A protein has these predicted regions:
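Walker A/P-loop
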Residues: 130
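ATP-binding Walker
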Residues: 127
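ATP-dependent small-molecule kinase phosphotransfer cores
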Residues: 149-186
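Post-Walker A helix-loop "phosphate-sensing" segment adjacent to the P-loop in P-loop NTPases
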Residues: 138-149, 157
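Hydrophobic anchor at the beta1->P-loop junction of P-loop NTPases
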Residues: 121
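P-loop (Walker A) phosphate-binding loop of NTP-binding proteins
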Residues: 124
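Catalytic alpha/beta core domains of metabolic enzymes, predominantly
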Residues: 1-115
Length: 186
């Protein structure tokens, strides 16, 4: 479960951002997310510094941070260098100002992140992930992994059976295990 906080008007002080992300950890969320609207480049720096501080204090707790709008675009590209675990981009049309197009994102990621290993998580159930995934595979030439099929193969049962017999918490652990394994793929 993602403990998500958005401020569409401003960027909080560094200490407050860390406090918000730590609250997600304290409430036993799987991931903490903080998104803000920067007014200056210094606001983006504040966000990235808070991200680094949170990762330094709690390296085992994944966080996602981003500054919205055009001014926040660097946080979407370079947030991983400060400890943000995930970034959001778009394959075709941006759904929000500052979203980075896939080609630009991969070009930057290939230059600044060690290796050439990326996992793209796109959309919610019924949002067209399969269609987008096929397009990303075509654009990038990278392997496509259907996460539901992966879980069903490893669990030797359907997702609905997993939910019915084990519950959501078990399914979420299956997702986490899958991401851990996929993260080690060459």
């Amino acid at each position: 479960m993602i403990g998500s906080y958005h401020d569409f008007h401003k960027t909080d002080k560094k200490e407050r951002i860390v406090e918000i992300l730590d609250a997600a950890r304290t409430y036993d969320m799987t991931v903490g997310k903080y998104a803000c609207m920067p007014e200056t480049k210094e606001d983006v720096d504040t966000l990235l510094e808070a991200t680094a501080r949170m990762k330094e204090a709690y390296p085992e707790f994944p966080v996602i941070t981003m500054a919205m709008g055009e001014l926040g675009k660097p946080s979407r590209l370079y947030g991983g260098l400060y400890g943000s675990s995930l970034s959001f981009g778009c394959a075709r049309e941006a759904s929000a100002p500052g979203q980075v197009y896939y080609e630009e994102m991969i070009s930057v990621f290939d230059k600044i992140y060690k290796g050439n290993h990326h996992i793209s998580l796109i959309g919610f159930m019924g949002a067209g992930k399969s269609t987008v995934s096929r397009e990303l595979k075509r654009l990038s030439g990278r392997e496509e992994v259907d996460t539901d099929q992966w879980i069903e193969k490893h669990e030797k049962r359907s997702i609905s059976d997993i939910f019915a017999t084990e519950g959501e918490a078990y399914f979420r652990q299956c997702e986490t295990d899958m991401l851990d394994e996929l993260g080690t793929m060459e």
